[in-house]
């Protein structure tokens, strides 16, 4: 797939981050594991795509595995490669749920308040270190789904 030469205004490009064994049709399916469908990719490193490449980015139960020290840089990169008017859909286990605590590879807990930092470009002080989001997503909708284990989010880029 060629991601450099395309008309940003016409062509839809979709990215599935952390596809695992569940690639999505019509998406570029990437994963850090050997199961990667289309491309091996470590999202904690700079992403190999030009600015505003994708109209839609999807990540299902991936972002809770991002190390804390990489959290803001990963979202900064997602924001960078998402086109204006594009959407980011993701779901993560709710902090404190059994789903969060039963997997020892979960490193980043999420709550509704976590999204404030992504949506409003806020800063977070933790253990004397200030982490900041120098970008802001637009909150499109946070569906009210009666699932006490998982949080679902849709963010946009204006």
Regions found by a protein language model. Give the residues of each.
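A conserved beta-strand element that flanks and buttresses the S-adenosyl-L-methionine
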Residues: 58
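Class I SAM-dependent methyltransferase "Motif I" SAM/SAH-binding loop
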Residues: 15-21
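Conserved beta-strand signature within the Rossmann-like core of class I S-adenosyl-L-methionine
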Residues: 85-93
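Core SAM-dependent methyltransferase catalytic element
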Residues: 139-158
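A short glycine-rich, Lys/Arg-flanked "PGG" loop and its adjoining helix->strand segment in the class I
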Residues: 72-84
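A short His-aromatic
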Residues: 65
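Conserved Class I S-adenosyl-L-methionine
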Residues: 101-131
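Adenosine-cofactor binding site in Rossmann-like domains, unifying the SAM/SAH pocket
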Residues: 21-50
């Amino acid at each position: 797939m060629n991601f450099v030469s395309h008309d940003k205004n016409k062509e839809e490009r979709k990215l599935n981050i952390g596809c695992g064994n569940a690639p999505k049709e019509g998406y570029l399916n990437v994963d850090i594991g050997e199961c990667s469908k289309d491309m091996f990719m470590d999202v904690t490193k700079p992403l190999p795509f030009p600015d505003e490449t994708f109209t839609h980015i999807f990540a299902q139960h991936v972002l809770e595995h991002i190390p804390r020290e990489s959290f803001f840089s990963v979202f900064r990169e997602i924001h960078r490669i998402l086109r204006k008017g594009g959407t980011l859909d993701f779901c993560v286990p709710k902090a404190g749920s059994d789903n969060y605590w039963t997997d020892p590879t979960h490193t980043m807990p999420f709550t509704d308040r976590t999204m404030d930092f992504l949506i409003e470009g806020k800063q977070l002080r933790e253990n004397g270190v200030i982490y900041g989001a120098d970008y802001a997503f637009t909150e499109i909708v946070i569906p009210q789904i009666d699932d006490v284990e998982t949080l679902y989010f849709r963010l946009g880029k204006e």
